[in-house]
Amino acid sequence: MSGCFPVSGLRCLSRDGRMAAQGAPRFLLTFDFDETIVDENSDDSIVRAAPGQRLPESLRATYREGFYNEYMQRVFKYLGEQGVRPRDLSAIYEAIPLSPGMSDLLQFVAKQGACFEVILISDANTFGVESSLRAAGHHSLFRRILSNPSGPDARGLLALRPFHTHSCARCPANMCKHKVLSDYLRERAHDGVHFERLFYVGDGANDFCPMGLLAGGDVAFPRRGYPMHRLIQEAQKAEPSSFRASVVPWETAADVRLHLQQVLKSC
């Protein structure tokens, strides 16, 4: 399938009841990065660049729950002080394996023409995410990569900054993915783009917060057995009517691809 067309050539309604613009993407497909696109936590992976492939206990002891970004700023600073340069970190990011079936899924999505608009929301960092995606040949698929800003500083060392501030009590201080996705949808609506359906592929606890934006007809793809999946199950059990989106757990990305294929067949 090289394109995506409504039945009988009719234009479809978006999720807010507006008529979808001709040629506009019909579906927004959002991916997490760590343990979703790639099969590791990239923040753990870069520890391989440290002396002895281990961080000192004095550094690890500085972590505070909810302030992981601040902790990772210290990790990058420490690595830089040990002589680790961005090119060394890039090599590590480039070598992180994709999750099983992920390359096929991303290739499938890329072949669907205007069906999908694809974005990535990650609490990792832009340098690492982009290094990984470029090495895998999938960077151009993503219209926007929304992650903590990072890049070489004036000394040539990798520096990390928080993505934004927010008032969500459930999320880390540097990123609320609900706010990130909400702001993106608002921006696209201002551009005249109104999506028919939202699809969200993730794994972590911070991927649960944006589930509040999903409505009937939308689909959450939590990685089976991971925190996002467990939180969805708890929410469904506590108040079944509160979670309106369909839930399709995945073990390999082939599970996501097969479901999206069925969605396109029903269009």
UniProtKB/Swiss-Prot annotation:
<dbReference type="GO" id="GO:0005829">
    <property type="term" value="C:cytosol"/>
</dbReference>
<feature type="binding site">
    <location>
        <position position="32"/>
    </location>
    <ligand>
        <name>Mg(2+)</name>
    </ligand>
</feature>
<dbReference type="GO" id="GO:0030500">
    <property type="term" value="P:regulation of bone mineralization"/>
</dbReference>
<feature type="active site" description="Nucleophile">
    <location>
        <position position="32"/>
    </location>
</feature>
<dbReference type="GO" id="GO:0052732">
    <property type="term" value="F:phosphoethanolamine phosphatase activity"/>
</dbReference>
<feature type="binding site">
    <location>
        <position position="34"/>
    </location>
    <ligand>
        <name>Mg(2+)</name>
    </ligand>
</feature>
<dbReference type="GO" id="GO:0035630">
    <property type="term" value="P:bone mineralization involved in bone maturation"/>
</dbReference>
<keyword id="KW-0495">Mineral balance</keyword>
<dbReference type="GO" id="GO:0001958">
    <property type="term" value="P:endochondral ossification"/>
</dbReference>
<dbReference type="GO" id="GO:0065010">
    <property type="term" value="C:extracellular membrane-bounded organelle"/>
</dbReference>
<comment type="similarity">
    <text>Belongs to the HAD-like hydrolase superfamily. PHOSPHO family.</text>
</comment>
<feature type="binding site">
    <location>
        <position position="123"/>
    </location>
    <ligand>
        <name>substrate</name>
    </ligand>
</feature>
<dbReference type="GO" id="GO:0031012">
    <property type="term" value="C:extracellular matrix"/>
</dbReference>
<feature type="active site" description="Proton donor">
    <location>
        <position position="34"/>
    </location>
</feature>
<dbReference type="GO" id="GO:0052731">
    <property type="term" value="F:phosphocholine phosphatase activity"/>
</dbReference>
<comment type="function">
    <text>Phosphatase that has a high activity toward phosphoethanolamine (PEA) and phosphocholine (PCho). Involved in the generation of inorganic phosphate for bone mineralization. Acts in a non-redundant manner with PHOSPHO1 in skeletal mineralization: while PHOSPHO1 mediates the initiation of hydroxyapatite crystallization in the matrix vesicles (MVs), ALPL/TNAP catalyzes the spread of hydroxyapatite crystallization in the extracellular matrix.</text>
</comment>
<dbReference type="Pfam" id="PF06888">
    <property type="entry name" value="Put_Phosphatase"/>
</dbReference>
<feature type="binding site">
    <location>
        <position position="203"/>
    </location>
    <ligand>
        <name>Mg(2+)</name>
    </ligand>
</feature>
<keyword id="KW-0460">Magnesium</keyword>
<dbReference type="GO" id="GO:0046872">
    <property type="term" value="F:metal ion binding"/>
</dbReference>
<protein>
    <recommendedName>
        <fullName>Phosphoethanolamine/phosphocholine phosphatase</fullName>
        <ecNumber>3.1.3.75</ecNumber>
    </recommendedName>
</protein>
<dbReference type="InterPro" id="IPR016965">
    <property type="entry name" value="Pase_PHOSPHO-typ"/>
</dbReference>
<dbReference type="GO" id="GO:0016791">
    <property type="term" value="F:phosphatase activity"/>
</dbReference>
<keyword id="KW-0378">Hydrolase</keyword>
<dbReference type="InterPro" id="IPR036412">
    <property type="entry name" value="HAD-like_sf"/>
</dbReference>
<dbReference type="InterPro" id="IPR006384">
    <property type="entry name" value="HAD_hydro_PyrdxlP_Pase-like"/>
</dbReference>
<feature type="binding site">
    <location>
        <position position="43"/>
    </location>
    <ligand>
        <name>substrate</name>
    </ligand>
</feature>
<dbReference type="InterPro" id="IPR023214">
    <property type="entry name" value="HAD_sf"/>
</dbReference>
<keyword id="KW-0479">Metal-binding</keyword>
<dbReference type="GO" id="GO:0016462">
    <property type="term" value="F:pyrophosphatase activity"/>
</dbReference>
<dbReference type="GO" id="GO:0030282">
    <property type="term" value="P:bone mineralization"/>
</dbReference>
